[in-house]
């Protein structure tokens, strides 16, 4: 039952990883300090599931390093992928275009404020200092609203308009006011009279009566108060409400009818008093506000209406065409990398750093690791499925039920490799949605007290189904691995003959092809099969076989220790090169003599009928060296003569 429970939980987690709606994860990042002390990084691949982001407004991703928030926020795309946003003046391709992240620093620039503006309907703040000069033209009510006293506008002369051309205008119409902002006109209002105050008091009482509880009302989205007109039936309640509204407006209708007048152009004119209305009908404009103001030349109503209609026609023009200076707005583009200065501001520590990406105030978080290396750190690549596990498919299945299905000795071998000064990197074709489960699996491997060393886990940024389709159906996992390794070579920025990858472990020929693509020597490409037999790719035809356990005994031979202190030293100061005796200096004559001595024909041996070897090509001078000495020659003759005499005596005796 324990295995069944583990299998059910693991299948649920696996389904969540496969389901695009719940897929979330982040790939580890590698930051390299290059030879010129600049920093370069691999892409920041982060993806959030749709169920983790219930609100479409959750677009801002907070990015933190080692628990400290950074100022480089990310933005979420439609598919849940996160990316950085930067502004540029250059042209941006359509697939890389985006909008800026919502923040005070990236908000669009506001247009310059105009001197004369229309007060907002629900503005409850105090009047700003910019409008203090217009206080004589308005009356501040008890509830904080500004009520204009008159709506007649006195125009300046054409000479003044020619001297100060307008920079823009906005023709605003309201139910209770008409203001022309940004134009070459300045409002001039009459002095406040007792009749005006009585009129304002009546308006206040009317507002209070309209806002009573006996009238069913509601406030719209734009702040307007509307009567409840639901039902569209002539019921008794509706009749009573209509009668109440009629009684409410009965006393005010004559006054409103006198104050409002509709002209030929459809404009509404609102006068402060009857005196102002009569003055406008006689002279064509309102009386002057004070003696200090210079009155404009009187104009007829027809001239004023013609000018207003002309402004209405010009209102259709865009504000951009009327602006004196055209501003160039920056373009915003997507990116997955940070610059060298931005990486340096993260205050990274050598080795492992923790990353976290949070959305919606930390309710949805993805974690990853960042490894800070140097350009001269040798890197060992290791596959996961089939290389650390015993097989591709069974490695996934037995991991789901909690059974160990790893090769024996792999933890100790990788630990010894890292102890000798090498960096380990885990490369797999799994999708980014399996990042957390893959890191959890590697972290929990333990064999005889040894665990796998820490290293970046590089996965495919594709979705789970796309990654499985490429690896299982198309059988081309090397497409992703080759592209990934090429990108990592670029961030190390080493010369072409050199490569940052020292060795590679895999289980297929596709892994060997990927490692060979980034110039890993064939003598250091190790392939392991499901039986645990390791062979070198170059010696595969020779039948050479080994295992992780036997490689532990020769780990210093395959991966010699690298001293950190002497890693950057020149090779001429090693023990072999520094302590050996220097080469002899030969003159030209000595070199000619040595060439003559070596030009003689070699002395090749020749077998005789007695089995001895004689040398051909021997000169007469050299033949004396191989002839026996006189002493040896006389000794041999005496020995042979004695033997002949004994043989003769024996023959004679036999004959007798």
From Swiss-Prot:
This is Nuclear elongation and deformation protein 1. Interacts with dis3, pim1 and nup189. Belongs to the lipin family. Changing residue 80 to A: No interaction with dis3; 10-fold increase in minichromosome loss. Residues 640-656 have a biased composition (Acidic residues). One of its GO terms (molecular function) is magnesium ion binding. SUPFAM superfamilies: HAD-like. Residues 99-121, 282-328, 587-656 are annotated as: Disordered. Coiled coil: none annotated. One of its GO terms (cellular component) is cytosol. May have a role in the maintenance of the nuclear envelope structure and in minichromosome stability. The modification Phosphoserine is found at residues 99, 103, 107, 159, 286, 318, 321, 587. Keywords: Phosphoprotein. The gene is ned1. GO terms for biological process: endoplasmic reticulum organization; fatty acid catabolic process; lipid storage; nuclear membrane organization; triglyceride biosynthetic process. Transmembrane segments: none annotated. Residues 99-118, 318-328 have a biased composition (Polar residues). It comes from the Eukaryota. PANTHER family: LIPIN, PHOSPHATIDATE PHOSPHATASE. Residues 291-300, 596-609 have a biased composition (Low complexity). InterPro entries: HAD-like_sf, HAD_sf, LIPIN, Lipin_N, LNS2, LNS2/PITP. It comes from Schizosaccharomyces pombe (strain 972 / ATCC 24843). The keyword Protein transport does not apply. The modification Phosphothreonine is found at residue 106. It holds the Pfam family Ned1_M.
């Amino acid at each position: 039952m324990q295995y069944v429970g583990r299998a059910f939980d693991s299948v649920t987690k696996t389904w969540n990883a496969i389901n695009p709606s719940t897929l979330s994860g982040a790939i580890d990042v590698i930051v390299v300090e290059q030879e010129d002390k600049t920093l370069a990084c691999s892409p920041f691949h982060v993806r959030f599931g749709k169920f983790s982001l219930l609100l479409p407004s959750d677009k801002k991703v907070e990015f933190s390093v080692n628990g400290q928030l950074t100022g480089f926020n990310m933005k979420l795309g439609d598919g849940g992928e996160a990316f950085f946003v930067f502004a540029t003046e250059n042209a941006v391709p359509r697939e890389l275009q985006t909008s800026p992240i919502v923040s005070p620093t990236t908000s669009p620039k506001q247009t310059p404020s105009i001197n004369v503006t229309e007060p907002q309907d629900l503005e409850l703040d105090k009047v700003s200092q910019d409008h203090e000069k217009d206080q004589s033209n308005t009356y501040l009510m008890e509830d904080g609203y500004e009520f204009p006293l008159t709506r007649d506008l006195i125009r300046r002369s054409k000479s003044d308009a020619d001297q100060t051309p307008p920079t823009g205008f906005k023709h605003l119409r309201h139910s209770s006011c008409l203001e022309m902002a940004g134009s070459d006109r300045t409002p001039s209002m009459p002095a406040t009279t007792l009749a005006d105050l009585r009129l304002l008091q009546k308006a206040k009482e009317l507002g209070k009566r309209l806002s009573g509880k006996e009238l069913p009302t509601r406030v719209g989205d734009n702040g307007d108060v509307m009567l409840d007109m639901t039902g569209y039936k002539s019921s008794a309640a509706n009749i009573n409400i209509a009668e109440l509204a009629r009684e409410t407006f009965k006393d005010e209708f004559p006054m409103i009818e006198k104050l409002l007048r509709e002209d030929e152009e459809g404009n509404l004119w609102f006068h402060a008093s009857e005196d102002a209305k009569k003055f406008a009908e006689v002279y064509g404009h309102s009386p002057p506000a004070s003696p200090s103001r210079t009155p404009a030349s009187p104009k007829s109503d027809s001239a004023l209406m013609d000018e207003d209609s002309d402004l209405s026609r010009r209102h259709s023009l865009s504000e951009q065409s009327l602006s004196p200076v055209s501003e160039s707005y920056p373009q915003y583009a997507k990116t997955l990398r940070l610059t060298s200065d931005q990486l340096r501001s993260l205050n990274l520590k050598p080795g492992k750093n923790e990353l976290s990406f949070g959305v919606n105030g930390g309710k949805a978080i993805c974690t990853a690791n960042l490894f800070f290396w140097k350009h001269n750190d040798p890197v060992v690549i290791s596959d996961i499925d089939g290389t650390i596990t015993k097989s591709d498919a069974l490695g996934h299945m037995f991991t789901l039920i909690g059974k160990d299905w790893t090769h024996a000795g792999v933890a100790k071998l990788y630990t010894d490799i890292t102890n000798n000064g090498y960096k380990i990197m885990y490369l797999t074709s799994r999708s980014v949605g399996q990042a957390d489960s893959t890191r959890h699996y590697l972290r929990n491997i333990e064999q005889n007290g040894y665990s796998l060393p820490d290293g970046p886990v590089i996965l495919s940024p594709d979705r789970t189904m796309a990654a499985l389709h490429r690896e299982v159906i198309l059988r081309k996992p090397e497409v992703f691995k080759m592209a990934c390794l090429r990108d990592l070579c670029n961030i190390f920025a080493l010369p072409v003959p050199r490569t940052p990858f020292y060795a590679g472990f895999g289980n297929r020929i596709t892994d060997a092809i990927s490692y060979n693509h980034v110039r890993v020597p064939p003598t250091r490409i190790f392939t392991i099969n499901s039986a645990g037999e390791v062979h070198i790719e170059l010696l595969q035809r020779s039948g050479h076989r080994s295992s992780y356990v036997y490689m532990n005994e020769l780990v210093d031979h395959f991966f010699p220790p690298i001293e950190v202190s002497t890693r950057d030293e020149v090779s001429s100061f090693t023990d072999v090169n520094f302590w050996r005796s220097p080469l002899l200096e030969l003159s030209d004559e000595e070199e000619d003599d040595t060439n003559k001595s070596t030009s003689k024909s070699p002395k090749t041996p020749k077998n005789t009928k007695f089995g001895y070897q004689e040398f051909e090509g021997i000169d007469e001078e050299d033949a004396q060296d191989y002839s026996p000495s006189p002493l040896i020659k006389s000794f041999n003759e005496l020995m042979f003569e004695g033997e002949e005499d004994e043989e003769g005596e024996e023959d004679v005796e036999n004959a007798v």
